[in-house]
């Protein structure tokens, strides 16, 4: 059973007024044990059992069949994370850091990519960004950090999802949209000055090491 809501609870009984067993977040997977009314009975890796509302979860096969992995669906999911607080090392809909936002959004579409921005930067297709951003597409990842010099290579320290028109969504303080256009009200001068390059990842899922769907990942078998 896959949790499809950003946040919720699993309960001791098939009743939301009963004692919670744990909280759950989007993408959590629990073992199906049966159904009772509007609930799935599920079990945890440690043996605990609980009831999970069908309104916030789906059987894995049903969930996967309904999945969309196109750019617009992924961006829509990213927008649904707006306002979620920044949490260093966070990778859930309760709190994220910059690379955790990217990883969490993609995981909600059954896509697994490396955890850290410094790893995410070197998968897929590297794109040197044109001055007018004409070669960057919606859904590309944009990376920021220390620019390379003759003495040392670049240092990746931040990542966001490109939305088009020099706008990107990222986690810094919280999840929000910033602009790399000085004329925009949400202009982010700090990150614009340290923009490095973009990465196009979607065409390379299940074709390149480090980027796959859960049904192709041994850990989830």
Regions found by a protein language model. Give the residues of each.
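Surface-exposed beta-loop interaction hotspot
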Residues: 1-2, 6-8, 12, 46-86
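Aromatic- and glycine-rich peptidoglycan recognition patches
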Residues: 1, 16-18, 58, 155-221
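...with weaker cross-activation on analogous glycine-rich loops/strands in unrelated enzymes
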Residues: 114-177, 182-184
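Active-site nucleophilic cysteine motif
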Residues: 78, 90-109
